[in-house]
């Protein structure tokens, strides 16, 4: 089985004149697959009802001509300014009622009807255009659900939370019994009286907080399933996934995993913190265990130093290869990176273009890997285009500019597209893990989890 090697590719952040050079460098580096269009909503849809696919057609065709497969994103993780201007009610709120304004990412209320409608229209347009493109081997839904914005306390969330509670408990009396609402005179007579666990004078009902966290995980999963159904309805037969974040408390990945065709993980251990390497090993074991006998992929890791920790250390010589092989040793079927090129003015960036220098050759007698004769840090040899390790059927495409029809390359099993349902009252939170605080000079003060966003 051939293993995939590559990373996020953001051509919309670069002049078109660099795209050919990008593909050439990828070929020299042995890249076999890139994740494309993750944050490209504003470029794909510059206005409501208006779509511009010409640039994306060009990029996908260039990658295909270069033998590089595409993990095509649905681009729904960051709504464009025109959307939030027209529909400000889609913006999320914190527990104090303050609005999370545009200007970053993940600025959408998961339960917002306006966001869901706009996201559905975007995904429909993308899926219908590229479902049959021979370069597309996988679909990347949204990005890191729950990242940066763990919980939304908006009015949209309040309405959806009440509906979730009504579906779970059926009656208000059952809710009162489960939450122990006679304590502090909290007894409800209607589901409409329930609000999300917003800021209160003192500690809030812990049972209510737990249910709100379960509701949040289920709501985010429902968003994923909504997009997956649209992709399947467009006739796309490739695998569909979204990227997990290790031991991430806001999402119950054990409930999500059955709906993933490929399990993927984003992992950013701190080069200054040995404990984070152990935490990343745990995260990799977690990914392998979520859906046994299913491929899992390290979707994101840093190419070197980051810019979002209190202290941002570069990786020491050998760390890149060691962390990559740590994932391979724990069953990863591919090694990918985030931001293979520096983005200059971007809010988040790695410091250099990946794979500018060849890595040392393996030690004599070392077992050769699927990356070719070089280490996974920066393979030097160009291999034949990879054969995906998961279901992929390419039959040519109906949109775009230079598709070459091909015969179907595989068959795939049916996929479940039914929406999730609230879990029983016996459900428990899983996968909580935190790295220990650091106190030594020059290190990060605290790392909340090994797989940060």
What residue ranges belong to the model's regions?
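Carbohydrate-binding surfaces of carbohydrate-active enzymes
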Residues: 191-194, 246, 257, 265-453
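Conserved, mostly hydrophobic/aromatic
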Residues: 7, 26, 34, 63, ...
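Polysaccharide-binding and catalytic clefts of secreted carbohydrate-active enzymes
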Residues: 96-262, 266-280
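Short, acidic/polar
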Residues: 13-28, 119-125, 244-257, 316-324, ...
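Aromatic-lined substrate-binding rim segments of carbohydrate-active enzymes
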Residues: 20-28, 32-100, 124-127, 226-234, ...
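The substrate-binding groove and active-site-proximal loops of carbohydrate-active enzymes
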Residues: 4-16, 37-55, 100-120, 142-150, ...
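Short, well-ordered coil/turn segments that N-cap beta-strands
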Residues: 1-5, 30-32, 64-70, 132-137, ...
């Amino acid at each position: 089985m051939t293993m995939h090697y590559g990373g996020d590719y953001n051509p919309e952040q670069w002049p078109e004149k660099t795209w050919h050079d990008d593909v050439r460098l990828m070929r020299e580096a042995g890249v076999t697959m890139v994740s494309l269009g993750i944050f490209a909503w504003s470029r794909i849809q510059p206005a409501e009802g208006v779509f511009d696919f010409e640039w994306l057609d060009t990029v996908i065709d260039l990658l295909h001509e270069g033998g590089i497969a595409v993990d095509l994103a649905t681009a729904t993780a960051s709504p464009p300014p025109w959307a939030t201007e027209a529909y400000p009610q889609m913006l999320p709120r914190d527990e104090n009622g303050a609005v999370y304004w545009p200007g970053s990412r993940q600025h959408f209320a998961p339960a917002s009807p306006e966001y869901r409608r706009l996201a559905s229209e975007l995904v429909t347009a993308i899926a219908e255009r590229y479902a049959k493109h021979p370069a597309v081997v996988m679909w990347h839904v949204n990005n890191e659900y729950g990242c940066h914005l763990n919980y939304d306390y908006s009015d949209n969330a309040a309405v959806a939370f009440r509906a979730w509670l009504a579906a779970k408990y059926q009656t208000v009396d059952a809710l009162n019994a489960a939450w122990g609402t006679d304590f502090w005179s909290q007894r409800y007579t209607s589901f409409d009286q329930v609000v999300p666990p917003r800021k209160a004078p003192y500690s809030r009902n812990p049972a209510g907080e737990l249910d709100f966290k379960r509701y949040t995980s289920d709501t985010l999963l429902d968003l994923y399933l909504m997009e997956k159904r649209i992709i399947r309805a467009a006739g796309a037969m490739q695998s569909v996934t979204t990227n997990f974040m290790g031991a991430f408390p806001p999402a119950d990945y054990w409930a999500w995993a059955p709906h993933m065709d490929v399990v993927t993980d984003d992992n950013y251990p701190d080069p200054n913190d040995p404990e984070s390497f152990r935490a990343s090993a745990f995260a990799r074991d977690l990914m392998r265990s979520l859906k046994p006998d299913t491929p899992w992929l390290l979707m994101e890791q840093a190419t070197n130093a980051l810019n979002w920790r209190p202290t941002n250390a570069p990786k020491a010589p050998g760390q890149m290869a060691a962390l990559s092989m740590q994932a391979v040793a724990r069953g990863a079927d591919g090694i990918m990176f985030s931001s293979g090129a520096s983005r200059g003015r971007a809010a988040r960036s790695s410091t250099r273009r990946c794979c500018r220098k060849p890595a040392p050759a393996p030690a004599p007698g070392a077992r050769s890997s699927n990356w070719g004769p070089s280490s996974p840090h920066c393979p030097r040899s160009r291999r034949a285009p990879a054969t995906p390790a998961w279901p992929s059927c390419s039959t040519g495409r109906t949109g775009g500019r230079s598709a070459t029809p091909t015969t179907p390359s595989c068959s795939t099993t049916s996929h479940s597209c039914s929406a999730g349902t609230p879990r029983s009252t016996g459900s428990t939170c899983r996968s909580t893990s935190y790295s220990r605080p650091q106190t030594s000079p020059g290190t990060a003060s605290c790392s909340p989890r090994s797989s940060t966003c």
